[in-house]
């Protein structure tokens, strides 16, 4: 049986690679799980739930998740400003995959 190498270009076009690109990041999965657990979450609440994340990192990560259509951002025209975040249907569809990864990690921890 001849084994072939998988080229980087070929690997980058797979669904696997695309999925990893969406959840790759120190806090992305934590943010997705926080939104799954609590539903609609305001920015400062999210910061409290996660803890060690900076405001700048939280803001940029939420913008990335919003651009990937995994998170919905709802802004209310009031003073002080009120912004809420929630999972989109697309974001919710990732949760079973993340659950599977967590389950595997729990069973295979060294």
Show where each model-derived region lies.
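Recognition helices and adjacent regulatory flanks at domain boundaries
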Residues: 1-12, 49, 102
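Long, contiguous secondary-structure blocks with strong helical propensity
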Residues: 8-9, 33, 46, 71-76, ...
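N-terminal helix-turn-helix DNA-binding core of bacterial DNA-binding proteins
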Residues: 10, 14-57, 84
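Generic recognition of well-ordered alpha-helical segments
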Residues: 18, 48, 60, 96-99, ...
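Alpha-helical linker/hinge and terminal dimerization helices associated
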Residues: 29, 68, 97-109
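Canonical helix-turn-helix DNA-binding module
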Residues: 44-73, 80
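Short helix-loop hinge/linker segments at domain boundaries
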Residues: 77, 109-110
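Basic, amphipathic "hinge/linker" alpha-helix immediately C-terminal to the N-terminal HTH DNA-binding motif
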Residues: 77-100
């Amino acid at each position: 049986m001849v084994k072939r190498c998988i080229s980087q270009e070929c690997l980058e076009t797979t669904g696997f690679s695309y999925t990893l690109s969406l959840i790759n990041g120190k806090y992305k999965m934590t943010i997705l799980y926080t939104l799954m657990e609590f539903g609609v979450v305001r920015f400062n609440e999210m910061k409290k739930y996660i803890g060690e994340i900076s405001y700048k990192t939280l803001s940029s990560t939420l913008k990335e998740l919003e651009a990937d259509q995994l998170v919905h951002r709802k802004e209310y025209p009031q003073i002080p400003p009120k912004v809420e975040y929630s999972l989109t249907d697309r974001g919710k569809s990732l949760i079973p995959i993340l659950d599977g990864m967590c389950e595997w990690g729990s069973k295979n921890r060294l």
